[in-house]
Amino acid sequence: MSRIVHFEVPADDPERLIHFYEEVFGWRIEKWDGPIEYWLVMTGPEEEPGIDGGLARRSEPDFGVEITVDVADLDQALAGVKSHGGEVIRPKSAVPGVGWMAYIKDTEGNVLGMMESDPEAA
């Protein structure tokens, strides 16, 4: 069974949204030390229930808040998306040092991320 492991919030003005979430929810938000403009969102202590997420500059107008589902085999999961009426909208690509990522639309048009963890991804 695949679990939701991450959320991502798009922002037209990342600094404004960071300030909003820090002040309203008390979340800790830090710039990611990676190859893209991205911020890590910590929603609470690791030992408590919940998930953390990320914040990125909005790149596509139809993307809202997106959840990411962890999958054991991304290629197999993408084949399942296609065979069950979904659509791959961003193909598999590497997130260096993290894993392999793709974005899909389900049968109702909802956008989800799918991630296969792989620290060797490059």
PLM segments and residue spans:
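N-terminal beta-strand motif that seeds the catalytic metal site of vicinal oxygen chelate
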Residues: 1-18, 65-69, 116-122
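Core segments of cupin and vicinal oxygen chelate
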Residues: 2, 8-50
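Vicinal oxygen chelate
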Residues: 9, 30, 78-79, 84-122
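Short acidic/glycine-enriched loop/turn segments that link adjacent beta-strands
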Residues: 34-38, 61-63, 95-100
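Short, charged/polar, Gly/Pro-enriched secondary-structure boundary elements
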Residues: 46-52, 109-112
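Mid-chain, well-packed structural core segment of small domains
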Residues: 60-89
